[in-house]
C-alpha cells in the first residue's frame, strides 16, 4: 500500500536516519516532496554525520575540561600516515568517517599488518581519510541524548547507559531514571563536572546542528581508568549519532512505561539457533513473570517482538 496513506494532515516522515535511497523509497510510496528532506539538505546531513564531527567536538571539550577528560583522534589522509601512526601507537582503533552503528571499525592489536594496510587503502580510496584512536581502559559506556529542533535550539533529552559486544556492536541498555544514572556515574565524575560537560556539549551541538538538523542526537561517551589523581577520566565524544538511536528508545521506554524507582535492561539478542532462542524466551517467561502496577512495568520479562519458529533475534525488557 502507499506509505502516503499513513500520514495525516501536516505530518512529516521521521526516519531513524536518512539517505538518498530512503528518500526515493518514500517518493515512490506516494509521499509528497515537501514532507521529505530535500537533496540539498541530505548533502548537508552527510557532512554533519561524519565521524570527523566527533574529532572537532572532542578537542573542544578537552580544551574546556582538561582536568577530567581524555580523548585523542588522529586524522589520517594517506597510507604512509596510517603506517606511521599505527606502528607508533602499537595498539589502536581505526575508524572510517562514514559507517553504520558499530561498523567501520578496525581494532589494530598487532601493528600495521598486511590486512590492516589493505583495509586502510580501501577506506582511503572510498572515503578519503580515516581516524586513529588509542584503545582506552574503559570502565563504562554511556551517552548524552539531545534533540535539535532545526531552529537553532538543542535540548538535553536524557542519559543512556549501554553495552556493546567485543566488536563494538550494540547489545542493550540499562533501564533506569536519569537520577539513577547520574548516581552510577558520580563515583567516577562529579555531578558538577557532568552537568558542565553536558551544557557545553549542548551549546556546541547547537552551533553545529541546531539550524540544519531536526531530530535526536546521541553523543556516546565513556568513563576510562586513568593514572591521574582521581583515577578516572571521561571521553566526552566517542561518537555523535545523528539519528534516532537505541539510547533514546530506552530512555523514552523507561520514562513512559516503567514504574518509578524500578531498574532493568533493554536488550537486543542474536541467537543463530532458533531452538536455543525459543528456549531462552520460554525460560525467561517462566522465571520472570510480568508485574504491572498502575499501568507501568514493575518487574518481569516482556518480549518486544514475537519469538517465532523462524526467529534468530529477540528484543526484550527485563525489570
Question: For each predicted feature, which ranges?
Answer:
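Phosphate-binding site of ATP-dependent enzymes
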Residues: 90, 114-171, 222-237, 241, ...
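A conserved helix-loop-beta module that forms one wall/lid of the active-site cleft
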Residues: 29-104
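Structural motif
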Residues: 15-21
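A long amphipathic alpha-helix within ATP-dependent nucleotide-binding catalytic cores
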Residues: 126-127, 134, 156, 168-232, ...
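Single conserved hydrophobic/aromatic residue that forms the stacking wall/gate
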Residues: 1-9, 13-14
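Glycine-rich phosphate-binding loop of ATP-grasp-fold ATP-dependent ligases
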Residues: 72-73, 91-117, 143, 166-185
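ATP-dependent carboxylate/phosphate-activation module, predominantly the ATP-grasp catalytic core
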Residues: 146-201, 241-268
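Peripheral (often C-terminal) accessory segments that flank ATP-dependent C-N-forming ligase machineries
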Residues: 259-319
Amino acid at each position: 500500500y502507499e506509505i502516503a496513506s499513513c500520514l495525516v494532515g501536516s505530518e512529516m516522515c521521521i526516519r531513524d536516519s536518512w539517505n538518498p535511497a530512503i528518500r526515493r523509497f518514500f517518493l515512490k510510496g506516494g509521499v509528497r516532496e515537501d514532507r521529505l528532506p530535500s537533496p540539498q539538505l541530505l548533502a548537508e546531513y552527510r557532512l554533519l554525520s561524519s565521524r570527523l564531527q566527533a574529532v572537532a567536538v572532542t578537542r573542544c571539550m578537552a580544551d574546556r575540561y582538561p582536568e577530567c577528560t581524555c580523548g585523542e583522534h588522529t586524522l589520517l589522509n594517506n597510507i604512509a600516515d596510517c603506517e606511521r601512526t599505527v606502528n607508533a601507537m602499537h595498539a589502536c582503533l581505526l575508524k572510517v568517517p562514514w559507517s553504520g552503528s558499530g561498523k567501520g571499525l578496525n581494532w589494530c592489536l598487532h601493528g600495521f599488518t598486511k590486512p590492516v594496510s589493505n583495509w586502510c587503502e580501501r577506506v582511503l580510496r572510498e572515503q578519503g581519510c580515516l581516524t586513529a584512536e588509542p584503545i582506552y581502559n574503559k570502565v563504562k559506556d554511556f551517552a548524552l541524548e539531545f534533540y535539535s529542533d532545526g531552529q537553532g535550539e538543542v535540548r538535553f533529552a536524557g542519559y543512556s547507559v549501554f553495552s556493546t559486544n567485543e566488536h563494538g556492536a550494540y547489545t542493550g541498555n540499562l533501564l533506569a531514571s536519569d537520577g539513577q544514572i547520574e548516581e552510577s556515574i558520580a563515583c567516577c565524575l562529579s555531578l558538577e563536572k557532568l552537568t558542565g560537560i553536558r551544557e557545553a556539549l549542548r551549546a556546541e551541538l547547537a552551533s553545529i546542528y541546531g539550524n540544519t538538523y531536526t531530530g535526536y542526537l546521541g553523543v556516546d561517551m565513556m568513563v576510562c581508568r586513568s593514572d591521574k589523581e582521581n583515577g578516572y577520566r571521561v571521553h566526552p565524544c566517542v561518537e555523535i549519532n545523528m539519528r534516532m538511536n537505541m539510547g533514546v528508545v530506552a530512555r523514552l521506554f523507561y520514562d513512559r512505561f516503567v514504574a518509578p524507582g524500578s531498574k532493568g535492561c533493554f536488550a537486543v539478542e542474536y541467537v543463530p539457533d532458533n531452538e536455543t532462542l525459543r528456549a531462552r524466551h520460554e525460560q525467561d517467561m517462566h522465571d520472570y513473570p510480568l508485574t504491572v502496577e498502575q499501568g507501568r512495568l514493575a518487574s518481569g520479562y516482556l518480549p518486544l517482538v514475537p519469538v517465532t519458529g523462524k526467529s534468530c533475534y529477540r528484543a526484550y525488557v527485563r525489570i
